[in-house]
Amino acid sequence: YFKVYVKIHNIKNLKASTYDLKKSMSLPSIINTLVEGNNYNPNTIKLTFKEGKRVTDYIALIADNTNNTKEEVEKVFADKKYLNELITKYWFLTDEILNSEIYYPLEGYLFPDTYYFNDKDVTVSKIIETMLDEMKNKLNDYKNKINNSQMTTHEILTLASIIEKEGKTGDFKDISSVFHNRLNISMKLQSCATSYYGLGLEFTDVGIATAEMMNSQNPYNTYIVPALPVGPISMPSLNAIEAAINPKNTNNLYFISDNEGKTYFFETAKEHADKKNELIAAGKWER
C-alpha cells in the first residue's frame, strides 16, 4: 500500500536513512517524515547483498563498506558460541549448520536484499541478525508447509541455493521439479554448480565442468554424493525458496541450457543427449 500511495500522490525525494517510526503514525505522517528527513542520519550506510552470491562475497562486502576488517568479519561468521546463540533465537536454524563438513555455517541463511545501517561502525552481528530477521519474516509464511514437508528447512534452503545457481528465475520451478523427481527415485542431482562450490570455484572461473571436477571428492559435489549436498552453496532468493517448496508437477529428470540462457527440460536421457548434440551442432553449447 505504501508504494501505491507514493505513486498515486506522485511523492518524490524520499530520503533513504534509518528512522524512528511509531506504530501509531499514519501513512501521511510517515511519508512526511521520509520527505522532510526528520531524524535524517547522513552517516547511514547502504549494503546490497545479491542473491546467488556466497558467504565469502558477503564477508568481503561487509569488510569493504564498514569499519570491520575482513578477519574480524570472518571470525564472527565462524564463532561457534555465537552460532549456537543464533540457533536458539531463530526457529529455522538448527544444529545441521554445525556439521563439520560445511564450509560456512550461515551459507544460504542470510536473506539477500538491500539494508540500511546507522553508520560504518555497525557490528557484524547486527548485520547478520538483521538479515536473519528478514529470512525469518520470509520463511514464516511457509512455516506450516515446511513443517509438513519431508525435507528439513536446511534441506529446502540447500535445494533453493542450487536452483538459484542453475537457471533463470522463470525456470526455477521447472528446475526444482527435476531435482525433486531425482531425489524421489534416489538419482544423483548431478549439478555442476555444486561441484564448483565444493572446489571453491565459480562457473565464471572455469566454464563447463570438467570430468576431473565432477569426480572431485567433497561433500558438496552432487556427481558424487547420493542426494543433496551437505549444505547450501549460495544465498537463495525468495523465488528460489518458493520453487524449492512448491516445484512444478512434471516427470522431467533432465535439463540443459544453451549459450543464450534458454533452458530445455526432458523426461529421458536420450532426449537430453539429442538436444545437447543439436545445440553443439548449432554452436549454442560449449563442450
Regions found by a protein language model. Name each.
Residues Y1-E134:
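Signal peptide-directed extracytoplasmic domains
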Residues T48, Y82-R287:
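Bacterial extracytoplasmic/cell-wall-associated proteins, especially those involved in peptidoglycan
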